[in-house]
Amino acid sequence: MSQAVNAKKRVFKTHSYRGVDLEKLLEMSTEDFVKLAPARVRRRFARGMTSKPAGFMKKLRAAKLAAPENEKPAPVRTHMRNMIIVPEMIGSVVGIYNGKAFNQVEIRPEMLGHYLGEFSITYTPVRHGRAGATTSRFIPLK
């Protein structure tokens, strides 16, 4: 009976990015992460980082430091939808502007290498009515 219990041991998925475990990614510098990333991300970082993303990263670090132990940090709002998610941002809460409101998104390991704008949709998806010619037909009042 004890062998049956041992056989059903639960295995939890550990996240990795291009073969590198999450623990190593968190210790990794942004320059080392960029070497793992696809060409579009490498090109973007090769062109240099302006002061706006650097200021945003500083605000994220401050929010993480100010957060109590085992609590989510305060959301940091941004209009920078073209910011690429790097390992340093994992665990942060970001308010991403979609043109109307700030959508709060918690940065998870699966989001690495993607743009912030991908997680804050800018339009309302269409909800179609009844299909066919019956929609324009006159409906008499009783």
From Swiss-Prot:
Protein's organism: Saccharomyces cerevisiae (strain ATCC 204508 / S288c) (Baker's yeast)
Where N-acetylserine occurs along the chain?
S2
The record's listing under PROSITE patterns reads:
RIBOSOMAL_S19
Name of the protein this chain belongs to:
Small ribosomal subunit protein uS19
Q: Subunit details for this protein?
A: Component of the small ribosomal subunit (SSU). Mature yeast ribosomes consist of a small (40S) and a large (60S) subunit. The 40S small subunit contains 1 molecule of ribosomal RNA (18S rRNA) and 33 different proteins (encoded by 57 genes). The large 60S subunit contains 3 rRNA molecules (25S, 5.8S and 5S rRNA) and 46 different proteins (encoded by 81 genes).
Name the protein family: Belongs to the universal ribosomal protein uS19 family.
Question: Could you tell me which Pfam families the record lists for this protein?
Answer: Ribosomal_S19
Give the transmembrane region(s): none
Matches recorded under SUPFAM superfamilies:
Ribosomal protein S19
A single GO BP annotation from the record? ribosomal subunit export from nucleus
Q: NCBIfam families, alphabetically? A: PRK04038.1, uS19_arch
Q: Which GO terms describe its molecular function?
A: RNA binding; structural constituent of ribosome
| Purpose | Component of the ribosome, a large ribonucleoprotein complex responsible for the synthesis of proteins in the cell. The small ribosomal subunit (SSU) binds messenger RNAs (mRNAs) and translates the encoded message by selecting cognate aminoacyl-transfer RNA (tRNA) molecules. The large subunit (LSU) contains the ribosomal catalytic site termed the peptidyl transferase center (PTC), which catalyzes the formation of peptide bonds, thereby polymerizing the amino acids delivered by tRNAs into a polypeptide chain.
